[in-house]
Amino acid sequence: MDDRRAIPIRFGEFVALSAAMMSTQAIAIDAMLPAFPAIVGALKVGNPNHGQWIVTAYMAGLGSGQLVWGVLSDRFGRRPIVLGGIALYVVAALVCGLTKSFEALLAWRFVHGLAAASATVVRSMVRDLYSGRQMARVLSLTFVVFLMVPVLAPSLGQAILWLGSWRYIFIACGVFASIVWCWAFLRLPETLHPEYRLTLDPVHIFRAARLVVLNRISMFYTLAMTVLFGSLIAYVGMVQQIFADVFHRPGIMPGMFALCAGFMGVAAFTNSRLVERLGMRLISHSAILVFIAISALHAAIAALGWEHMWTFVLLQAATMATFSLSVSNFGAMAMEPVGAVAGIGASLQGCISTGAAAVVGAVIGRDFNGSTLPLATGSLWCGLIALGFVLAAERGRLFQQQHAGAG
């Protein structure tokens, strides 16, 4: 389906606004990365590794909140849910900036993530309007714009730290979300057709969720996304410690993080240009195999003690590029069979992929030992497990051709 003419917003602005709403999720993580040592010191946290909990608490809220927002968006429409969620996000960000204890910060970071989860409704909006390879193209273009945040946010966070307190980073997140809220309030259309609105009847919700869970393609591609997201969360949680404790160059972390994110952006843009011609399966299946190969090479280099800052950056950038090519298409393929219940479908998939990924990332992150080996081996295992889920989805055969509109 392609209903571009049915909504009072141009295609380019819809992509940009969708990316801006999704970016509220990322900026709350990426802008905080340079501030971990300052927060740990200011709030008197004993174990420096516990700074990663700032990400973990947020991701836990992000995962659990998606199910709630998705169900509500299927009942009340996409627009009011997105606007309400962003408003709560602004409040949570400001309160995080005022907290006096680490425990209170973690509690409000959970709320912060809970509110940020409303932006996942954007995937439902895209599914309302597009399907198949067109949907994959729109999601890839959205991802390209969205990736400007991890490119710029760490440098923004570092600049704020140079000028003042880490608390101002949370305030900056709130200001950014306020601007996005105003844009959405003025321009965001309602994409859910009235006849597709569902009741809040628990039986109906259960049936819709059952449709998602029991669909082989939807569920196994969701699980493949989950473990790959886990490797990304581990990287985000560990990157500041890696540059500080392994390479002793904490000051260049924002720039190197931006470089890796830039590779993700290039990959997402490339996907948007090629996916309608080559198909989601050819691109994503090739990408996951390359992801595994790069992770294996990285793990070997780290195990042999040959790791250098530039080997880490280049291999991690390549890993992130293949991650982008894999996940953007996995997400589109997971959504394709559940268009009739897109809100519940996107929220359930997001709840599983984000919530479980936070656990995977925490498990990898807790093993940080002053080297890059835990991250490299963790990424390798995540890639292998993701490949297993892809094989389960495709009944053991990669690169299967689908009709042009679907895969």
What are these regions (language model features)?
Residues 80-95, 174, 283-298:
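Structural signature of the two symmetry-related core transmembrane helices
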Residues 104, 132-133, 137-186:
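Helix-loop-helix hairpin linking two adjacent transmembrane segments in secondary transporters
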Residues 2-8, 189-221:
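Juxtamembrane intracellular "pre-TM" segments in multi-pass secondary transporters
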Residues 63-103:
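Conserved MFS/SLC helix-loop-helix module at the cytosolic interface between two early adjacent transmembrane helices
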Residues 45, 77, 98-103, 115, ...:
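Helix-breaking motifs and short loop linkers at transmembrane-helix boundaries and internal kinks
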Residues 35-64:
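Extracellular/periplasmic helix-loop-helix junction of adjacent transmembrane segments
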Residues 108-146:
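Cytoplasmic helix-loop-helix junction between adjacent transmembrane helices
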Residues 282-329:
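C-terminal transmembrane helical hairpin of 12-TM major facilitator-type secondary transporters
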